[in-house]
Design a protein with these regions (language model features):
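An N-terminal assembly and electron-transfer interface module characteristic of large anaerobic redox
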Residues: 1-221
Length: 221
């Protein structure tokens, strides 16, 4: 929603239901919705409301046959993450570890398709069946948990996942924490390829500390 719809107090569920009855929307076409007025909170608040609304739409009334751990996967919820390179790194790390996972919001290919003359409509992304199967995962990791209070509450209370607390996988220490938590949940070892990658980062930090230690920097943009 936008501000005007929230000020008026539109009943989105009824609006969508009436549109189905009148034939504007096919009966079997999913239309999730979320309340995201811009006068409440920030972009991250809206993202949390959006994700919780989608998760609720696809799973709340379909929990009868769901069982925690049944699909052997780990769910990842990135939060309001705008740098698409981070998604690709996460995909690569999980593939190298051999971990079964679902990235429950994955705009990588949708927002970053190549300029090669080919038309790709809705390329990539998270499939609907992944979203519907999410409660069957072993657990769900929220990668920016301070942004996602509504999502955390829904996943804990409805999906019955533990949602362990972790820091955003950024930098050496927090990426270590992330990978070790994934290893603990999945039972998969962290491969030598990622250990070597970590070692190169430590080597780079050691080599450059003479020039960077104690220095202040400013970031713009």
């Amino acid at each position: 929603t936008t501000c005007m719809a929230e000020v008026i107090g539109d009943d989105l569920n009824a609006f969508i239901g009436n549109a189905r009855k009148e034939g504007y929307i096919p009966e079997d076409f999913p239309v999730p919705f979320a309340h995201t007025p811009s006068f409440v909170g920030s972009h991250t608040t809206g993202w949390d409301n959006m994700f919780e609304g989608i998760a609720r739409y696809f799973t709340l009334n379909f929990m009868e046959d769901k069982e925690v751990g049944a699909n052997g996967k780990i769910n990842f919820v990135p939060g309001f993450e705008t740098y698409l390179g981070n998604y690709r790194v996460m995909h690569r790390m999980m593939r190298e570890m051999g971990v079964e996972y679902s990235l429950l919001c994955d705009p990588t290919e949708v927002l970053d398709t190549p300029a090669d003359g080919a038309l790709r409509t809705y390329d990539g992304g998270t499939r609907l069946d992944e979203r519907q199967d999410a409660p069957n995962a072993i657990d769900t990791l929220l990668l920016q948990p301070w942004q996602l209070p509504k999502t955390r509450k829904y996943v804990e209370t409805t999906w019955k996942h533990d949602v362990p607390k972790i820091s955003i996988p950024m930098g050496l220490e927090w990426t270590d924490e992330f990978l070790m938590k994934v290893s603990e949940i999945s039972g998969k070892e962290i491969p030598a390829s990622l250990a070597l990658e970590r070692g190169r980062l430590v080597d780079m930090m050691t080599d450059s500390h003479t020039w960077l230690h104690g220095k202040k920097i400013s970031l713009y943009g």
